[in-house]
């Protein structure tokens, strides 16, 4: 197993493809993302963005080609890759009856974060995602923007090297979009985020990867 966690390349694909019978979901994607880059994965709905992200995170096996996170082939190192990434799917599930603080405590335990680090990790993600004012409110009663930030805090708990976010501002009102963009820009992580909104790209990303009909443009 090769570990290039100290390399500049944090996300890498080569010839990555996914087929469903005769249907081409994603075909021959080759790209790389360097440490510290925030990259927008831009394309219309149905372009193949979510399929690609699921292959990068190990939730979906590619038909052909390879995906690497921190130098590790995803297909061969799913557990280790899961420790290196924070994955925020579009409309990711949250326990709406829980409060943000109870949810963060629950997932800190579920991820076996050491007791000596648990409080400081939770405090750090609360600060990163600006959740101080809603910690004890039921998640189901929070605005969509705050719920998205709770989701971000959750995937940051284990201090991943790479963040993969699928449409992180989808369905938010303009003020919520600004809040989530500010949070993303302040994280200082290697981030791949998908969007179908061109105007959003310069506000949050360093560069763009364009995809349409499952192929890079």
Where are these regions (language model features)?
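Pre-NBD coupling/linker segments of ABC/ABC-like ATPases
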Residues: 1-7
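ABC transporter nucleotide-binding domains
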Residues: 8-13, 18-212
């Amino acid at each position: 197993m090769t570990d290039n966690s100290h390399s500049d390349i944090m996300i890498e694909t080569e010839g990555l493809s996914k087929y469903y019978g005769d249907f081409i979901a994603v075909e021959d994607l080759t790209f790389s993302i360097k440490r510290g880059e925030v990259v927008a994965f831009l394309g219309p709905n149905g372009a193949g963005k979510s399929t690609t992200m699921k292959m990068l995170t190990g939730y979906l096996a590619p038909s052909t080609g390879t995906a690497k996170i921190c130098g590790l082939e995803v297909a061969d190192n799913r557990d280790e890759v899961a420790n290196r990434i924070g994955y925020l799917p579009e409309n990711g599930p949250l326990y709406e009856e829980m409060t943000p603080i109870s949810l963060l405590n629950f997932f800190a335990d579920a991820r076996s974060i050491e007791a000596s680090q648990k409080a400081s990790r939770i405090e750090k993600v609360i600060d990163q995602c600006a959740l101080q004012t809603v910690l004890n409110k039921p998640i189901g009663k929070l605005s969509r923007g705050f719920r998205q930030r709770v989701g971000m805090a959750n995937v940051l708990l284990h201090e991943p090297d790479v963040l993969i976010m699928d449409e992180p501002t989808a369905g938010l009102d303009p003020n919520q979009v600004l809040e989530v963009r500010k949070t993303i820009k302040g994280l200082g992580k290697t981030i791949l985020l998908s969007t179908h909104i061109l105007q959003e790209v310069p506000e949050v990303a360093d560069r763009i990867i364009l995809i349409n009909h499952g192929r890079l443009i």
